[in-house]
From Swiss-Prot:
It comes from the Eukaryota. Its EC number is 6.5.1.3. One of its GO terms (biological process) is hematopoietic progenitor cell differentiation. AMPylates itself (auto-AMPylation). Pfam families: RLIG1. Keywords: ATP-binding, Ligase, Nucleotide-binding, RNA repair. It is an enzyme of class 6 (ligase). Functions as an RNA ligase, in vitro. The ligation reaction entails three nucleotidyl transfer steps. In the first step, the RNA ligase reacts with ATP in the absence of nucleic acid to form a covalent ligase-AMP intermediate and release pyrophosphate. In step 2, the ligase-AMP binds to the nucleic acid and transfers the adenylate to the 5'-PO4 terminus to form an adenylylated intermediate. In step 3, the RNA ligase directs the attack of the 3'-OH on the 5'-phosphoanhydride linkage, resulting in a repaired 3'-5' phosphodiester and release of AMP. The keyword ATP-binding applies. Its cofactor is Mg(2+); Mn(2+). This is RNA ligase 1.
Length: 325
């Protein structure tokens, strides 16, 4: 699988942004909007945005595959957040007029405890061996997804550690107009980040599965490249999102040659998300499990078993996949 950038921290917007004092369409109870101006940001220019690879920004929750207990494991995103006292100090600092000075964090005392198995995200700055919080006062990180952890039950539904495989959605290797759901060795995904999408994630913007029969999948970051993107101008991108089938996506992530990731979200352009008919649901999808060795070894209720029952079947769109349980 071709590897692009890894999502280990929040991505900056391709445009310089400004805050407008009107209710957010992205977050309930947020009294302001963050909107893109027409100026491309210095971060984007420094990362050579014009030579970057544009890909679909997928709406789910971020995951990571790395080693745990001497085998490839799926990890869930868990950001360490400040305790109440530290959060209050930080908010006062942000709202003060004399905020030219840098805020001082005491990582050992200011943050809520993390699970023992927690690891900080890669690429974040460290001082004296301690990770430095981001501009929101969070320390991005990961925790391994254990099989019986109810908190991460939807994460664990897409992996099988006995056979070291994961359920992955990507383009069919021989037909870019066809999507494919397959069981991929976790070892092929090592050190990659992916997006978990499905019934119980982020309000299910792609309409996958049902409450009775939930369906979740992993999508490698950068899996869906955008072929005919217009010029990097505010109005051209706005027209593209509004006017063509390929633009019916949450946003764009540019994978830059230096590993930097730059994004634009529909909300940055004043557009709504989620939307009724997404581009992801406009393409046919085929099931290709290729699991002859372990056909009879799965729990009858698990996702892998459900997909084996419809192996090699083709559906007009992802929404049409219904398990006959």
């Amino acid at each position: 699988m071709k590897r692009l950038g890894s999502v280990q921290r929040k991505m900056p917007c391709v445009f310089v942004t400004e805050v407008k004092e009107e209710p957010s369409s992205k977050r309930e109870h947020q009294p302001f909007k963050v909107l893109a101006t027409e100026t491309i940001s210095h971060k984007a220019l420094d990362a050579d945005i014009y030579s970057a690879i544009p890909t679909e920004k997928v709406d789910g929750t971020c995951c990571y595959v790395t080693t745990y207990k001497d085998q490839p494991y799926l990890w869930a995103r868990l950001d360490r957040k400040p305790n109440k006292q530290a959060e209050k100090r930080f908010k006062n600092f942000l709202h003060s007029k004399e905020n030219a000075k840098e805020f001082f964090w005491n990582v050992e005392e200011d943050f809520k405890p993390a699970p023992e198995c927690w690891i900080p995200a890669k690429e974040i700055e460290q001082i004296n061996g301690n990770p430095v919080p981001d501009e929101n006062g969070h320390i991005p990180g990961w925790v391994p997804v254990e099989k019986n952890n109810k908190q991460y039950c939807w994460h664990s539904s897409v992996v099988n550690y006995e056979f070291e495989i994961a359920l992955v959605l990507k383009h069919h290797p021989d037909d870019s107009g066809l999507l494919e759901i397959s069981a991929v060795p976790l070892s092929d995904l090592l050190e990659q980040t992916l997006e978990l999408v499905g019934t119980n994630i982020n309000g299910n913007p792609y309409g996958l599965g049902s409450k009775k029969h939930p369906l979740h999948l992993l999508i490698p970051h950068g899996a869906f490249q955008i072929r005919n993107l217009p010029s990097l101008k505010h109005n051209d991108l706005l027209s593209w999102f509004e006017g063509c089938k390929e633009g019916k996506i949450e946003g764009i992530v540019w994978h830059c040659s230096d590993g930097c990731l730059i994004k634009v979200h529909r909300h940055h352009l004043g557009l709504c998300w989620p939307i009724p008919d997404t581009y992801m649901n406009s393409r046919p999808v085929i099931i290709n499990m290729n699991l002859n060795k372990c056909d009879s070894a799965f729990d009858i209720k698990c996702l892998f078993n459900h997909f084996l029952k419809i192996d090699n079947q083709k559906f007009a769109r992802l929404k049409d996949i219904i398990f006959d349980v």
